[in-house]
């Protein structure tokens, strides 16, 4: 009878070890959501750290893609979001009007609308996940937006990272596209 008890104890210990290892592994899996915005829902991907200090606000980085891009950021945003989550920082990546999974017309891709979308995203993250200090990372046109967000947006940001930011609106020289309402796109 003693060998069975010993075997049962060893099995219980093994299960506890497996459970502990599983619980201690960071769970920073990205989650695709839609965030309510002023012009409709904003397709986004959030990535949260596995754990954060209790009672402390969670820092947030908003990743802003470039002209005709999407929230994947040419494949650079996902690894960046994973690294930030592993270091206790939440991220959200969004698709601006006419880009990625956005159902809005591309004519709505303006700096003012992009800033309004970032406002909606920051407000949502604060209300839903208790995020606090916020930084913006912007690539290309997203970098242009990030540089202007302190004047255009409603939320304070503590840091800006500009990744090859666009100069001007980024649309100069593209007149050959002959897009209807091209003048409406900033």
Locate predicted features.
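The serine-hydrolase catalytic nucleophile loop
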Residues: 69-81, 96
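N-terminal cap/lid segment of alpha/beta-hydrolase-fold proteins
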Residues: 20-55
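Short beta-strand immediately N-terminal to the catalytic nucleophile in serine-hydrolase-like folds
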Residues: 136-138, 163
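Gly/Ala-rich beta-loop-alpha elbow adjacent to hydrolase catalytic centers
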Residues: 138-142, 146
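The alpha/beta-hydrolase serine catalytic core
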Residues: 32, 42, 144, 151, ...
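Short beta-strand element of the alpha/beta-hydrolase
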Residues: 56-66
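Conserved alpha/beta-hydrolase
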Residues: 81-103
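Catalytic nucleophile-loop/oxyanion-hole region of alpha/beta-hydrolase
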Residues: 73, 99-131
């Amino acid at each position: 009878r003693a060998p069975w008890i010993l075997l049962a104890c060893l099995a219980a210990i093994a299960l506890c070890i497996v459970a502990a290892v599983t619980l201690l592994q960071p769970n920073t899996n990205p989650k695709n959501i839609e965030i309510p915005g002023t012009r409709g829902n904003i397709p986004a991907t959030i990535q949260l750290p596995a754990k954060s200090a209790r009672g402390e606000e969670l820092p947030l980085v908003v990743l802003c893609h470039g002209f005709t891009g999407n929230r994947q950021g040419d494949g650079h945003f996902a690894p960046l979001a994973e690294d930030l989550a592993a270091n206790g920082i939440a991220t959200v990546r969004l698709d601006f009007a006419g880009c990625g999974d956005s159902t809005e017309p591309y004519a709505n891709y303006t700096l003012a609308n992009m800033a309004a979308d970032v406002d909606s995203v920051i407000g949502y993250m604060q209300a839903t996940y208790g995020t606090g200090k916020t930084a913006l990372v912007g690539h290309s046109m997203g970098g242009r937006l990030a540089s202007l967000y302190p004047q255009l947006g409603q939320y304070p940001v503590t840091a800006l990272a500009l990744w090859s930011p666009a100069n001007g609106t980024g649309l100069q020289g593209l007149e050959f596209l002959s897009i209807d309402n091209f003048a409406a796109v900033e």
